[in-house]
């Protein structure tokens, strides 16, 4: 299959620039992948799609305020760093601007000097490895100095940075939010749990590769970015029990899907506690191991995420659903509306 097979025209005004006032007031397009039937609902009605004994699996990663503005110690020149991933100890892989002026050994100071960094390695495409030096706890220093790295298609300033976090965000480490989870409120989750649905959490730290367009025509030539994931023994045991008793594993978002399917692929369809790095690329033709249904937002044309959804529901049905959503003025991308596919 070719990348162009997953293209569609999206009017720019449908790209949501800000979150809705109420998280669960967003729209929900429900799609039956067997019959092709579609229903227009509001997100709160996702509870009607869940049955007692099902498991709802969510990614509890927390977005880092990963954009830092600083100065080169020697010259005072302005520097922007975007933290991508923690490689070891106090060393991070970052995207740097202007990269060509940041050679190995360059020192950078941030804010009032509470945080500084030295470049230890040069990578391709503006990438650098830097080692941070600071007083106190790194994440606390970052919270006070860093800015939230919103996706490139969002041009409005975010008034409340917590609106780019899920209400259950806990494990710091992402460069982007697992946006399918942004629709849930604590009240809705309590209602879902009261219905007899198991709430299960895993962690996948979302990398910026999630926004990177596919640059090759042939999907077989596309290389996925790697992201760190973790599933606890308690969560794995709950999911095994749900499957054994005939319940469904329902994933919230593509990051939860990629974690569950990575583990299912690794352990021959079994769900085991595990952690590591995944670069799984789920595209049409993929044989599903774990996930029975999922919710997800509306994704960018020609993105690996549209391909993942198409692997579950079929390319034609997914593109039909997207065209329906466009006609009905659904909001797209990170702050947009959602779909539920079963």
Curated annotation (Swiss-Prot):
Name the source's superkingdom.
Bacteria
Q: What is its main location?
A: cytoplasm
GO CC, one annotated term = cytoplasm
The record's SUPFAM superfamilies line, in alphabetical order, gives: QueA-like (SSF111337)
Reactions accelerated catalytically? 7-aminomethyl-7-carbaguanosine(34) in tRNA + S-adenosyl-L-methionine = epoxyqueuosine(34) in tRNA + adenine + L-methionine + 2 H(+)
Can you say what this protein is called?
S-adenosylmethionine:tRNA ribosyltransferase-isomerase
Q: Which PANTHER family match?
A: S-ADENOSYLMETHIONINE:TRNA RIBOSYLTRANSFERASE-ISOMERASE (PTHR30307:SF0)
EC number per UniProt: 2.4.99.17
Q: Which Gene3D superfamilies match?
A: QueA-like
Q: Does the keyword ATP-binding apply?
A: no
Q: Please name the pathway.
A: tRNA modification; tRNA-queuosine biosynthesis
The GO molecular function terms of this record are: S-adenosylmethionine:tRNA ribosyltransferase-isomerase activity
Question: What is this protein's gene name?
Answer: queA
Described purpose of this protein according to its UniProt entry: Transfers and isomerizes the ribose moiety from AdoMet to the 7-aminomethyl group of 7-deazaguanine (preQ1-tRNA) to give epoxyqueuosine (oQ-tRNA).
Q: Which UniProt keywords apply?
A: Cytoplasm, Queuosine biosynthesis, S-adenosyl-L-methionine, Transferase
Q: Which family does it belong to?
A: Belongs to the QueA family.
Supply the Pfam families for this chain.
Queuosine_synth (PF02547)
Gene Ontology process terms (BP): queuosine biosynthetic process; tRNA wobble guanine modification
Q: Where in the cell is it found?
A: Cytoplasm
Oligomeric and partner information: Monomer.
